[in-house]
Curated annotation (Swiss-Prot):
<feature type="binding site">
    <location>
        <begin position="345"/>
        <end position="349"/>
    </location>
    <ligand>
        <name>FAD</name>
    </ligand>
</feature>
<dbReference type="InterPro" id="IPR036884">
    <property type="entry name" value="2Fe-2S-bd_dom_sf"/>
</dbReference>
<dbReference type="InterPro" id="IPR006058">
    <property type="entry name" value="2Fe2S_fd_BS"/>
</dbReference>
<keyword id="KW-0001">2Fe-2S</keyword>
<dbReference type="InterPro" id="IPR036010">
    <property type="entry name" value="2Fe-2S_ferredoxin-like_sf"/>
</dbReference>
<dbReference type="InterPro" id="IPR008274">
    <property type="entry name" value="AldOxase/xan_DH_MoCoBD1"/>
</dbReference>
<dbReference type="InterPro" id="IPR016166">
    <property type="entry name" value="FAD-bd_PCMH"/>
</dbReference>
<feature type="domain" description="2Fe-2S ferredoxin-type">
    <location>
        <begin position="4"/>
        <end position="91"/>
    </location>
</feature>
<feature type="binding site">
    <location>
        <position position="917"/>
    </location>
    <ligand>
        <name>Mo-molybdopterin</name>
    </ligand>
</feature>
<keyword id="KW-0520">NAD</keyword>
<dbReference type="Pfam" id="PF02738">
    <property type="entry name" value="MoCoBD_1"/>
</dbReference>
<keyword id="KW-0285">Flavoprotein</keyword>
<feature type="binding site">
    <location>
        <position position="919"/>
    </location>
    <ligand>
        <name>substrate</name>
    </ligand>
</feature>
<feature type="binding site">
    <location>
        <position position="113"/>
    </location>
    <ligand>
        <name>[2Fe-2S] cluster 2</name>
    </ligand>
</feature>
<dbReference type="GO" id="GO:0009115">
    <property type="term" value="P:xanthine catabolic process"/>
</dbReference>
<protein>
    <recommendedName>
        <fullName>Xanthine dehydrogenase</fullName>
        <ecNumber>1.17.1.4</ecNumber>
    </recommendedName>
</protein>
<dbReference type="Pfam" id="PF01315">
    <property type="entry name" value="Ald_Xan_dh_C"/>
</dbReference>
Amino acid sequence: MSNSVLVFFVNGKKVTEVSPDPECTLLTFLREKLRLCGTKLGCAEGGCGACTVMVSRLDRRANKIRHLAVNACLTPVCSMHGCAVTTVEGIGSTKTRLHPVQERLAKAHGSQCGFCTPGIVMSMYALLRNAEQPSMRDLEVAFQGNLCRCTGYRPILEGYKTFTKEFACGMGEKCCKVSGKGCGTDAETDDKLFERSEFQPLDPSQEPIFPPELQLSDAFDSQSLIFSSDRVTWYRPTNLEELLQLKAKHPAAKLVVGNTEVGVEVKFKHFLYPHLINPTQVKELLEIKENQDGIYFGAAVSLMEIDALLRQRIEQLPESETRLFQCTVDMLHYFAGKQIRNVACLGGNIMTGSPISDMNPVLSAAGAQLEVASFVDGKLQKRSVHMGTGFFTGYRRNVIEAHEVLLGIHFRKTTPDQYIVAFKQARRRDDDIAIVNAAINVRFEEKSNIVAEISMAFGGMAPTTVLAPRTSQLMVGQEWSHQLVERVAESLCTELPLAASAPGGMIAYRRALVVSLFFKAYLAISLKLSKSGITSSDALPSEERSGAETFHTPVLKSAQLFERVCSDQPICDPIGRPKVHAAALKQATGEAIYTDDIPRMDGEVYLAFVLSTKPRAKITKLDASEALALDGVHQFFCYKDLTEHENEVGPVFHDEHVFAAGEVHCYGQIVGAIAADNKALAQRAARLVKVEYEELSPVIVTIEQAIEHKSYFPDYPRFVTKGNVEEALAQADHTFEGTCRMGGQEHFYLETHAALAVPRDSDELELFCSTQHPSEVQKLVAHVTALPAHRVVCRAKRLGGGFGGKESRGISVALPVALAAYRMGRPVRCMLDRDEDMLITGTRHPFLFKYKVGFTKEGLITACDIECYNNAGWSMDLSFSVLERAMFHFENCYRIPNVRVGGWVCKTNLPSNTAFRGFGGPQGMYAGEHIIRDVARIVGRDVVDVMRLNFYKTGDYTHYHQQLEHFPIERCLEDCLKQSRYDEKRQEIARFNRENRWRKRGMAVVPTKYGIAFGVMHLNQAGSLINIYGDGSVLLSHGGVEIGQGLNTKMIQCAARALGIPSELIHISETATDKVPNTSPTAASVGSDLNGMAVLDACEKLNKRLAPIKEALPGGTWKEWINKAYFDRVSLSATGFYAMPGIGYHPETNPNARTYSYYTNGVGVTVVEIDCLTGDHQVLSTDIVMDIGSSLNPAIDIGQIEGAFMQGYGLFTLEELMYSPQGMLYSRGPGMYKLPGFADIPGEFNVSLLTGAPNPRAVYSSKAVGEPPLFIGSSAFFAIKEAIAAAREDQGLSGDFPLEAPSTSARIRIACQDKFTELLEIPEPGSFTPWNIVP
């Protein structure tokens, strides 16, 4: 049969593709074939939602059009036949009309960098197409599959809450809509960041119609399809016989419905499946049949359809019949994200046979019956298969044979004496794979609590889902009681062992979870037995009952308070007003252009990297011949294409290489690069390059290993001292020695590193680069190409996030791309895939601190001797400066008269770690907060009282000899304690902890003091350029880069006030080295401080030139003045410059200067609740008070505070980097690396800006805001530690206990020692090789 023609619709337009590639995704097709670049590539594994589009199809079974949010990165374009695709461009634009979904997100300040915005817009749009007025729960579900690294999620939810049934203020009866006044406001403060009344209403009648051509005829559905390429053939049969014949002919063929598993295997494991079968038009696999015994679902029915029908039946049928249904929907809620559940099917989940499948334990415990069919000897054969013991025969294998097809699954109704419950524990609740899950199905003897039959299934404990038959048999005939729990716990520990080196790690935790999840099931079933009257109400102690519960996402409550602008401030003066991000509307419509959105150029090639697969080794052979033999592959680049000098690069020290030269120092180091016609071909060719190695030792991965081998960079350690530490420690009432440790953190900007290099005339090179430091890229590109800098221009219009990760590491991509473009004489492009980016570009520095502190019996700290170690990776990068800031911030807000702080930069065989928001400050302050809590614990005082006792006062000196001016930390503290109802909550928490054994709450107060300036003096400068045109419009250029932090918006505001004109007259096009030269990186939170003052400098020059004209025409307009100036030959272009004064401290050469220009302070109070049985936790509330001077833009600044808090929360609680003992990064995408999602924000999230605190040392009395709030996220960590301490007290354990950051569920559970953890035998460290280690 010849190739079929692919037909589908995109944004109402018919698309016909004659020879579609079965390996092509919908995302690739949209971006490269149709140039619809609003849909973004964020991860390629369906984990971030940046690629979300809406797919509409007519369900002819129900005669209903279904609108589904899907991940375009996983959706095969071949599966779109007969469908209608809607992208963000298709619902509205700034040139025509904004859709309310786009408008509300933008105007509610829900878009910062904007890279995730189109995906979030489309998730919401798809929801509204299915429910005109959704509930808040619908919103929660809709965004399970979307991530945002910038905003902290609050403003997105606030904007979209206006569409919901429950739309109302979170303050309930106290709402200002009821009382008539603002939430907590007074004459000085405001709380409205956006005006809801300005939103255009949603009018469903205006939505695009489903294409009539698809609706009127079933021709697209009834047609069997074949799409073939030279590697893969895609089949879409339309009846069961055709499907079974294909499977008989190609037994190894993969059946693809949602492509959520196969797509990941093909992309990341590089599997090649020559035959793919799409069975979505075979009615037998789509059937839903109901009878008195239960419901039968076809194997290809989507998980969302299953969920919806089961929820309906739960509402309609008696509870006793729907316990399996309820158990299923409970598990489905946490099964991936909605985009995945919309297309994934239960049959795929069963047949994939993942050992951590969420549904297989439920189906195995329930003994589900499966229907299977095959075509043998020309005949259709069917048989039934029982899911239970023996069904899974090995890793991803089961008893269903290769030529057979799973037709469907029976869900039986439960009986009155039957109970089935399931629990799942993951790193993060929403959209995460299980660490361990469990399902327990028990049937009791009639109207009793005597076990008649029980089946228990567990995931995450073996290569397959496993049952526990021996333990189950032990329970038969036994009374369901606490005595049974003890026996079961011991038996499960024996029956389900786990090797100390088992893949996945967390051995003790996983073994503890098996017992703990059973116990949660015991509690849940006991409560149901009690409720039904079978057991007495007091059979289960009241304090144990909450142990049966799981966390649920509450409806968000929030408040944002900021200083009201003066009533006499001109309306056109935007300073201090909550203005919308300048690019927010374009970001919400997909019109905003990022580096990889730039249209492909004639002759352009793609560059793909060959990466090291060894942590430390000599390269003995490098052979690209096989790769170069492929059609469309043009050239291979390696160290041989550069001189030794040209190949040596680095941001400060040239201790790195463009391409590894003779030796590799870590996994993921760039060895070479392949230039080819397109990305897929270049990456395939790169995998064909043969690299042979001679491995070297030792391989050093961890800080402890570096200390053991004395593997430090030259000139370290370094020390900073103040006073006499030895003497003070000797005289102290108390001394204490401690250690604390924290891991690294992946930046996870949604836009990965990208660069496009274009050769121009006269040996010029033009680079478009996702970098925070265009001048550094310019300088190093000139270095590797041996060009003068004036021949190289680097441009950065906007970045899809940066957080420091694009300050120095952008050279990893930009330099090879520039070299290839220069040598080949044609445009070259590269945008790293997420796994490449995470492997290559480094992370936040892990730190280890060892300290000895002396203090009085009242808790006044008198001395501290502290050692700081950071894990730099294999090259220096900026690690020396990160260490210095940690050493300068370790004391946080506390005055310590005698200090010795030493710092070591550890050299290891990891990718070079780099700048990350906070730049060592959060790590240093983390040590300081451990110290203050150690002191409080030892002297027996409340930690807040000890904080107050030790706080710096205005006029005090730090240990690096800077005097503190205008230091308002006490005011921040008192305001925050009041705002958070601290004293009242302490009592509530104490009461809760007394009443609950397996749930505990904790609360923590964390202050912060963050120094504002670059640590290297020469970087504290900025330039600007302002051009005024004849029509009065103003083009502003400055040296900062728009990363999403609102820098361009603030610069426009500054210029508008300085020039006295409306913001709408001012435009910023891009950051470019030919506009403003010799720029500093946009980092260190000083973007607004430096560039804002440079902008003012240029404005002042222009104002001076225009002053005589304004005097001559006092009643004139701006345009008239500019027109007059032009004809008077007055220059309407000016440059500005600013150098931060009074800084550059050095103890010998500049002892009277400051290290930092000033400090930004704040305080946060966070309350958490933990599940002591699983280690799960939930942030109940966070209150933050920040001193940011006179805010330039409260909406942007509060957005920065919330986003920084959530990033800090992730750093200290969720985000764990997983490395092999040899230094290979396991966590290379959102599947394993978990940053906070929508459901992780505090249930109550309040931010208040300190009023009446202008800062004289920055533009318009403002303060820096990007980095300072991040450390407040640690308040969740310290609150968790308080909650753990409460759990340990119930176990009779007192005193301190170790808890590393991040405080993952594993660490929380193991720290909550109890009768279950006591059953575990933990092997001694060193007696085995662990699966993973902490760097």
